[in-house]
């Protein structure tokens, strides 16, 4: 296994451990992921450094999900399906972000720089879908971006807590985004 692949696996395990044990010390986190405290200390010397490293890594992975989803090239519905599946493939990082993101992180230039372009890419995708008539135009592209993120994070968290099964989450998320919860198509009132 390459060093990068080993670091990737360690980061994912640490992200999950930090969600499962939010107040754990570095020593407790090391034990939870099966490495020595010295190994974890060489990787990150403080908990704050670990959070920053995980935030930056999560941003890189999430931005790669956008590229892998082929948002510009694939047909819009297929791209949406790809986007959901790509995000679900990295559910440990999604949950880590959900539990560890704080509004003051937007003041940290290094973290925000790593996220540069993420929302804008999603906004552009939803705008393309609106122009093609796939997505509603009475909801802004920015709002659709926020809805996508909310649906994915809430479904991943519900699975983590045992409320819903993993099977079918992608389909549920896609159907919610495309059709909402209405049993019938909306009619003009």
For the regions a protein language model found, what residue spans apply to each?
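N-terminal intrinsically disordered/low-complexity leader segments
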Residues: 1-8, 185-189
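Short, amphipathic alpha-helix enriched in basic
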Residues: 4-31
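HTH DNA-binding helix-turn interface
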Residues: 18-23, 41-52
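Central "turn" residue of the DNA-binding helix-turn-helix
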Residues: 33-34, 45
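Key DNA-contact positions within bacterial/archaeal DNA-binding proteins
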Residues: 38
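Hydrophobic alpha-helical connector segments
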Residues: 53, 64-92
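Amphipathic alpha-helical segments used for helix-helix packing
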Residues: 81-109
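Hydrophobic/aromatic-rich alpha-helical bundle segments in the mid-to-C-terminal region
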Residues: 99, 112, 131-175, 186-189
């Amino acid at each position: 296994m390459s060093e990068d692949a080993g670091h990737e696996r360690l980061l994912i395990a640490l992200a999950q451990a930090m969600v499962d044990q939010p107040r754990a010390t570095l020593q407790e986190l090391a034990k939870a992921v099966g490495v020595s405290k010295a190994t974890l200390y060489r990787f990150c010397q403080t908990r704050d450094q670990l959070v920053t490293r995980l935030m930056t890594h999560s941003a890189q992975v999430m931005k790669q999900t956008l590229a892998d989803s082929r948002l510009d090239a694939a047909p819009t519905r297929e791209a949406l399906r790809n986007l959901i599946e790509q995000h679900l493939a990295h559910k440990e990082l999604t949950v880590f972000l959900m539990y560890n993101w704080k509004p003051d992180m937007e003041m940290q230039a290094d973290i925000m720089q790593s996220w540069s372009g993420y929302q804008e890419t999603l906004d552009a995708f939803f705008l393309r879908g609106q122009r093609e008539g796939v997505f509603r135009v009475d909801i802004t592209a920015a709002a659709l971006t926020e809805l996508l993120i909310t649906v994915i994070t809430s479904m991943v968290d519900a699975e983590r807590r045992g409320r819903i099964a993993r099977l079918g989450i992608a389909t549920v998320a896609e159907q919610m985004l495309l059709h909402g919860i209405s049993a019938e198509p909306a009619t003009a009132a």
